[in-house]
Amino acid sequence: MEENMNFITLTEPAARQIKILKSNFDNEVCLRIGVKQGGCSGMSYSMNFESVSSLRETDEVLMLDSFLVACDPKSLLYLYGLSLDYSSELIGGGFQFSNPNASQTCGCGKSFSG
């Protein structure tokens, strides 16, 4: 498990929402951020909580106030420098990704092409 403090940045609203969501879990969990095939533009973002014991040696890990953010090496190629924000607006709310590596994004903001 390697540490890289710059692979992703979180705004204060995003960090606050992640802490709220994390509080729903009893065990020690981290937030895994990655990419998967699919979505309007070819790739889509994935975010889920998983047990800290599931972290792999090859994962990049970012330690924040009270939680870990993990990313696998293949996803990191597409996500390095990602900024994650959160909005509670009824229309267009939720987590919002700002990815400097995306050559094209779709209107929903949840998928991109590299």
Curated annotation (Swiss-Prot):
GO biological process, one term: iron-sulfur cluster assembly
InterPro entries associated with the record: FeS_biogenesis (IPR000361), FeS_cluster_insertion (IPR016092), FeS_cluster_insertion_CS (IPR017870), HesB-like_dom_sf (IPR035903), ISCA_plant_cyanobact (IPR031108)
GO cellular component terms listed in the entry, alphabetical order: chloroplast stroma
Record-level Gene Ontology MF annotations: iron-sulfur cluster binding; metal ion binding; protein-macromolecule adaptor activity
Coiled-coil stretches: none
Subcellular localization: Plastid, Chloroplast
Plastid listed as a keyword: yes
Entry keywords, A to Z: Chloroplast, Iron, Metal-binding, Plastid
Annotated residues for binding of Fe cation: C40, C106, C108
Major place of residence: plastid
Family classification: Belongs to the HesB/IscA family. Ycf83 subfamily.
Protein name (Swiss-Prot/TrEMBL): Uncharacterized protein ycf83
